[in-house]
């Protein structure tokens, strides 16, 4: 195995040496050479292949063609470059794009195929894929292959790439409750996610701190639960824009509404929803988690999640279920009476009762669900297709042991525990995130097939729009490559060179990505 890895490392290093630009994330299979072709910005075109199922009018690809032309060449005109005989023009200055299945008006899903093949040689410049989602990934790779000489001439090397993701779920979580993130910050994040081939935006919309989601069924939730009901909310149009913006980049929107804990912001808008806490025999004036003993709680949840199910088109909703503090439930005599009536002797049983009822409600709306690991740990009865997200890194249960237990029980798993980007420390902390191997647990091949990917999490206690971008990028890129590329792509020196280059490319694209070491970029951020 060591010899195999050394050979792979040498091969990758050789590939990097003959590429004028480095790719991020690294593709599964690549052949490239020093032979290069000139591109002319003034007449370069993206064009549909005659045999493609998608043609002009396919909004996903039409919009992508416009975006990538701008990313490559900008909006100005360029003088025609002079070139020697060794610099061969690239065909007719056209990238032909061919897809087998046109899904132009659909949404990406967990089963979407993102494979693509990119061929650049003397005879053709062709991007082939089974779906438009694969074509989007190939367009990003193509954009990273194009490079500009010191004289201002655009080139691309002779290249053959066959590429596909290692995991189908590659996400970023943004917390928009603890600090409100303007719509522009979310859209900007979606752009850079596409550059990194992420495909899931996990939107942690609400929490204890605020309820910025504008509910049309329960408008008081937003009016009384947001930081500011005018300036710090996401309107129905905002949510719709995020979903469509993400779709055009091949990104799913996984909405999270976490209950029964993390719900203090819900209380003012829905009287009676939260549990009143007691101090001795008297009400303390404070509130705890959702009250699981009242029928009105489940009536509300049924109506509310009917709305959510209609607003968010993805098959999956994230229902949370983490960090439920039992202190308030323990203090409340009505909760104690309810538990006695039900025969519950443990507050985890009460929590399980609530969550099981909620899961049944959501299932009735033909939705699947993702939950945090506590739902599994507390032995809540869930459907076999439930996805469990692992976030707890601390002992006594190390996260790989947790994944082993989850997959042994037959459930699919997502890994987030080692990828909390809101946590920062001095130095190149991206390296530790890059070194994580999601399948490094004892398990059968069938178990390991149940790990469907992971997410980088950006919790918002100390993050808002002022520091979101440099804290996310390019650090999140380490997770992007770990979830996309082969498990053999692990050489740290090779990764460092490519990530440094990619960080400079992000600056060129107007993204204020932080440095990963000492150095410089030809085009610094203030020059964009």
Curated annotation (Swiss-Prot):
Catalytic activity: Hydrolysis of terminal non-reducing N-acetyl-D-hexosamine residues in N-acetyl-beta-D-hexosaminides; N-acetyl-beta-D-galactosaminyl-(1->4)-beta-D-3-sulfogalactosyl-(1->4)-beta-D-glucosyl-(1<->1')-ceramide + H2O = a beta-D-3-sulfogalactosyl-(1->4)-beta-D-glucosyl-(1<->1')-ceramide + N-acetyl-beta-D-galactosamine; a ganglioside GM2 (d18:1(4E)) + H2O = a ganglioside GM3 (d18:1(4E)) + N-acetyl-beta-D-galactosamine; a ganglioside GM2 + H2O = a ganglioside GM3 + N-acetyl-beta-D-galactosamine
Keyword flag Cell inner membrane: no
GO CC term, one of those recorded: lysosome
Catalytic residues, chain numbering: 323
Single GO molecular function: beta-N-acetylhexosaminidase activity
EC id: 3.2.1.52
Glycosylation sites: 115, 157, 295, 487
Matching PANTHER family: BETA-HEXOSAMINIDASE (PTHR22600), BETA-HEXOSAMINIDASE SUBUNIT ALPHA (PTHR22600:SF39)
Function statement: Hydrolyzes the non-reducing end N-acetyl-D-hexosamine and/or sulfated N-acetyl-D-hexosamine of glycoconjugates, such as the oligosaccharide moieties from proteins and neutral glycolipids, or from certain mucopolysaccharides. The isozyme S is as active as the isozyme A on the anionic bis-sulfated glycans, the chondroitin-6-sulfate trisaccharide (C6S-3), and the dermatan sulfate pentasaccharide, and the sulfated glycosphingolipid SM2. The isozyme B does not hydrolyze each of these substrates, however hydrolyzes efficiently neutral oligosaccharide.
Protein name in the entry: Beta-hexosaminidase subunit alpha
Organism: Rattus norvegicus (Rat)
Underlying gene: Hexa
């Amino acid at each position: 195995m060591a010899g195999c890895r050394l050979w792979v490392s040498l091969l990758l290093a050789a590939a990097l040496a003959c590429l004028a630009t480095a790719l991020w994330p690294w593709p599964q299979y690549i052949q490239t050479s020093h032979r290069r072709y000139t591109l002319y910005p003034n007449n370069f075109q993206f064009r549909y292949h005659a045999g493609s199922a998608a043609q002009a009018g396919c909004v996903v690809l039409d919009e992508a063609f416009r975006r990538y032309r701008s990313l490559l060449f900008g909006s100005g005109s360029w003088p025609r470059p002079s070139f020697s005989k060794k610099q061969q023009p690239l065909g007719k200055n056209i990238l032909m794009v061919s897809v087998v299945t046109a899904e132009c008006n659909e949404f990406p899903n967990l089963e979407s195929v993102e494979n693509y093949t990119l061929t650049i040689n003397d005879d053709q410049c062709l991007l082939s894929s089974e779906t438009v989602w694969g074509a989007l990934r190939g367009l990003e790779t193509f954009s990273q292959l194009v490079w500009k000489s010191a004289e201002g001439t655009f080139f691309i090397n002779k290249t053959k790439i066959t590429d596909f993701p290692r995991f189908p779920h590659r996400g970023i979580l943004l917390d928009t409750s603890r600090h409100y993130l303007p719509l522009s910050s979310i859209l900007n994040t979606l752009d850079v996610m596409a550059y990194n081939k992420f495909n899931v935006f996990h939107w942690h919309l609400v929490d204890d701190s605020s309820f910025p989601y504008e509910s049309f069924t329960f408008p008081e939730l937003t009016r009384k639960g947001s930081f500011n009901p005018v300036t710090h909310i996401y309107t129905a149009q905002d949510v719709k824009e995020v979903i469509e913006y993400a779709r055009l980049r091949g990104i799913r929107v996984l909405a999270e509404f976490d209950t029964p804990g993390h719900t203090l912001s819900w209380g003012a808008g829905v009287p009676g929803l939260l549990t009143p806490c007691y101090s001795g025999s008297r009400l303390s004036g404070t509130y705890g988690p959702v009250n699981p003993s009242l029928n009105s709680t489940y009536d509300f949840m049924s109506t509310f999640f009917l709305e959510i199910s209609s607003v968010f088109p993805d098959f999956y909703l994230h229902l949370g279920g983490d960090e439920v503090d039992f202190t308030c439930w323990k203090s409340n005599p009505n909760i104690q009476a309810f538990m006695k009536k039900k025969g519950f002797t443990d507050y985890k049983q009460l929590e399980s009762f609530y969550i099981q009822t909620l899961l049944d409600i959501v299932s009735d709306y033909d939705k699947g669900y993702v939950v945090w690991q506590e739902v599994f740990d507390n032995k809540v009865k869930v459907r076999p297709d439930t996805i469990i997200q692992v976030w707890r890194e601390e002992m006594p249960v190390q996260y790989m042991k947790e994944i082993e237990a989850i997959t042994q029980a037959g459930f699919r798993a997502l890994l987030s525990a080692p990828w909390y980007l809101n946590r920062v420390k001095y130095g190149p902390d991206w390296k530790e995130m890059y070194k994580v191997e999601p399948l490094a647990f004892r398990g059968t091949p069938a178990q390991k097939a149940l790990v469907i990917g992971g997410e980088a999490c950006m919790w918002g206690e100390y993050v808002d729009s002022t520091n979101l971008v440099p804290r996310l990028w390019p650090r999140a890129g380490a997770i992007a490559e770990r979830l996309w590329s082969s498990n053999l792509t692990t050489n740290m020196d090779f990764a460092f060179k490519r990530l440094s280059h990619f960080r400079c490319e992000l600056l060129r694209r107007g993204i204020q990505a932080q440095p990963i070491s000492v150095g410089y970029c030809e085009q610094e951020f203030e020059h964009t």
